[in-house]
């Protein structure tokens, strides 16, 4: 079984990157013993989706996430702190869809993301709902505000270090009650093991 395949997402969500980039993503996941499970169904073609990724407690989460993006050949924009976009790594992350943000002004970033995505026809946007690798009691509401602003459903993607699996979960439809939605999603993620469980 391959570690990951572009067939797990619709053609409309693929970036058509060079085969070498896709091979690199698959090979890195295989070398590390990881695989990507689940899929995004064809019923979501030409629709916006916010992909939330958790638990997030380590830089390894980002490495595995970028490898999965490459292996899936996913055309996805993902938000990351600006300090990660330095030197040559920054150029590569932007090539893979990364958007550097200044966490001192998150509101402006959210509004910019909403306006940008509104102009597109079917977009994947990746967000770490915790907003940090440190332990937090409650997630930030930014991903729900973005989902509401672009009329998007949510794909909960998990990174489980116990099983070495990245799972594309079933679609979550926001209810409009942010506190309830965050509580429900945090409950969903309780079964997954973080790289540093004490931070989650």
Regions found by a protein language model. Give the residues of each.
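Soluble catalytic domains of membrane acyltransferases
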Residues: 3, 14, 34-191, 199-200
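Long hydrophobic alpha-helical segments that form multi-pass transmembrane helix bundles
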Residues: 23, 196-200
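Extreme N-terminal tail/first-helix region
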Residues: 1-37
